[in-house]
């Protein structure tokens, strides 16, 4: 099944169809923004300092897993500074002319937000360096012997870059951001406040316990929490429930196959495949992809991260391996310790692995 045809998951951290509705419940100021305390406090200080000096805020790099509020925070920065906001993404800026058009239309101190900034092409990055450092744009006009260099002065501006893969950002680009900020997963109590706020905006009567039930199943991600909240509203609304409590919210989410830990049917199918078909691993990701009918990048980017974060899955040099917690989650007894140690040290395991260096898909 190709990625465009793959069923969308409610617990997907990346944007999916229907997520446009989340804009209606986004916070509009740092005071309304819940969670990310250190990021908020630091940004507040830097914004106050920039406003006091009547200067553009230094360039900001927001990095972390998807769905944690990087776009929302960029919009809030512009609102707190009381300046204009322009948004684009790395893949959209295909050539230097596209970037030049964006930069030359900025007003003094405006915020330019580039999502997926790690996907900028090298040619565009080269143009961006002097724009960020000196607020100047160096362009080549014409071709061949008639080509000439033109320098355009730009108004001071703030570039806010966002990425889920900070390791792919080149070092020269990374060093030009004066304010790098890492976004962390949210605690259930923080997500409970976010869910409760969203319910109020949506006109939904949700108890505190109901909000916490949704929060616990949201994978530490506000985007997932908002998505689950809207689906709970749909199910409970059709059922005629005026007030949604923990039992009603839990029942709705169980109906959607999202369990108390935030795992869905695809997560369980993945874990079951390793346990039942490959003796708990180690097994290569290409083999798993073939068994599940999924591409490697789908497994690595959308399924495995949360399983690893929760301690149910381990990546080893020989492939994927269920942890003791993974076995217990499936209701299975963990294997004997000596066999597990042999797998981790590279010995032949129940997954039928090959000696290190001969495997094709770890």
Swiss-Prot record:
Where in or outside the cell it occurs: the entry states: Cytoplasm
Reactions mediated catalytically: ATP + H2O = ADP + phosphate + H(+)
Region described as Small ATPAse domain (RuvB-S): spans on this chain: 187-257
Q: Which InterPro entries match?
A: AAA+_ATPase, AAA_lid_4, DNA_helicase_Holl-junc_RuvB, P-loop_NTPase, RuvB-like_N, RuvB_C, WH-like_DNA-bd_sf, WH_DNA-bd_sf
Q: What class of enzyme is it?
A: hydrolase
The keyword DNA damage is annotated on this UniProt entry: yes
Residue positions binding Mg(2+): 71
Positions contributing to DNA binding:
296, 315, 320
| Classification via SMART domains | AAA (SM00382)
Q: Which Gene Ontology biological process is one annotated for this entry?
A: DNA recombination
Positions with a binding annotation for ATP: 25-26, 67, 70-72, 133-135, 176, 186, 223
> What do the Gene Ontology cellular component annotations say?
cytoplasm; Holliday junction resolvase complex
Cite the residue spans of the region called Head domain (RuvB-H): 260-362
Keyword annotations of the record? ATP-binding, Cytoplasm, DNA damage, DNA recombination, DNA repair, DNA-binding, Hydrolase, Nucleotide-binding
Region annotation Large ATPase domain (RuvB-L): where it falls in the sequence = 4-186
User: EC number(s) on record?
Assistant: 3.6.4.-
Gene Ontology MF annotations: ATP binding; ATP hydrolysis activity; four-way junction DNA binding; four-way junction helicase activity
- Key word DNA-binding present in the record? yes
Q: Which CDD domains match?
A: AAA
The record's subunit annotation is: Homohexamer. Forms an RuvA(8)-RuvB(12)-Holliday junction (HJ) complex. HJ DNA is sandwiched between 2 RuvA tetramers; dsDNA enters through RuvA and exits via RuvB. An RuvB hexamer assembles on each DNA strand where it exits the tetramer. Each RuvB hexamer is contacted by two RuvA subunits (via domain III) on 2 adjacent RuvB subunits; this complex drives branch migration. In the full resolvosome a probable DNA-RuvA(4)-RuvB(12)-RuvC(2) complex forms which resolves the HJ.
Family label: Belongs to the RuvB family.
What the entry lists under HAMAP family is as follows: DNA_HJ_migration_RuvB
Q: What does this protein do?
A: The RuvA-RuvB-RuvC complex processes Holliday junction (HJ) DNA during genetic recombination and DNA repair, while the RuvA-RuvB complex plays an important role in the rescue of blocked DNA replication forks via replication fork reversal (RFR). RuvA specifically binds to HJ cruciform DNA, conferring on it an open structure. The RuvB hexamer acts as an ATP-dependent pump, pulling dsDNA into and through the RuvAB complex. RuvB forms 2 homohexamers on either side of HJ DNA bound by 1 or 2 RuvA tetramers; 4 subunits per hexamer contact DNA at a time.
- UniProt remark on domains: Has 3 domains, the large (RuvB-L) and small ATPase (RuvB-S) domains and the C-terminal head (RuvB-H) domain. The head domain binds DNA, while the ATPase domains jointly bind ATP, ADP or are empty depending on the state of the subunit in the translocation cycle. During a single DNA translocation step the structure of each domain remains the same, but their relative positions change.
Write the protein's name: Holliday junction branch migration complex subunit RuvB
UniProt source species: Rhodospirillum centenum (strain ATCC 51521 / SW)
């Amino acid at each position: 099944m190709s990625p465009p045809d793959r069923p969308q998951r409610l617990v997907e951290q990346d944007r999916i169809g229907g997520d446009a509705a989340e804009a209606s419940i986004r916070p509009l100021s740092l005071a309304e923004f819940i969670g990310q305390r250190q990021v908020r406090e630091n940004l507040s200080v830097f914004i106050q300092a920039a406003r006091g000096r009547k200067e553009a805020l230094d360039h900001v790099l927001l990095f972390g897993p998807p769905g944690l509020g990087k776009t929302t925070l960029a919009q809030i920065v512009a609102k707190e500074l009381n300046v204009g906001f322009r948004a684009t993404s790395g893949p959209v800026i295909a050539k230097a002319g596209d970037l030049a058009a964006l930069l030359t239309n900025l007003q003094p101190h405006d915020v330019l937000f580039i999502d997926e900034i790690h996907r900028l092409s090298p040619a565009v990055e080269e143009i961006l360096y002097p724009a960020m450092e000196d607020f100047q744009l160096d362009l080549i006009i014409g071709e061949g012997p008639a080509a000439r260099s033109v320098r355009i002065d730009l108004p001071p501006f703030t570039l806010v870059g966002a990425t889920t893969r900070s390791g792919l950002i080149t070092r020269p680009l990374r060093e030009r951001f004066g304010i790098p900020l890492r976004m962390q997963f949210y605690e259930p109590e923080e997500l409970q406040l976010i869910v409760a706020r969203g319910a109020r905006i949506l006109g939904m009567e949700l108890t505190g316990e109901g909000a916490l039930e949704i929060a616990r199943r949201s994978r530490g991600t506000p985007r997932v929490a908002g998505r689950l909240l809207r689906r709970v509203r749909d199910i409970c609304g059709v059922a005629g429930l005026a007030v949604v409590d923990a039992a009603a919210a839990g029942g709705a989410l169980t109906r959607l196959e999202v369990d108390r830990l935030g795992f869905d049917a695809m997560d369980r199918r993945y874990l079951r495949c390793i346990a039942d078909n490959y003796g708990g691993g180690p097994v290569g990701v290409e083999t798993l992809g073939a068994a599940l009918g999924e591409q490697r990048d789908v497994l690595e980017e959308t399924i495995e991260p949360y399983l690893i974060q929760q301690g149910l899955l381990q990546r080893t040099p020989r492939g994927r391996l269920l942890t003791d917690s993974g076995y217990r989650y499936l209701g299975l007894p963990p294997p004997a310790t000596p066999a597990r140690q042999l797998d981790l040290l590279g010995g032949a395991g129940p997954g039928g692995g090959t000696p290190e260096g001969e495997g094709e898909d770890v």
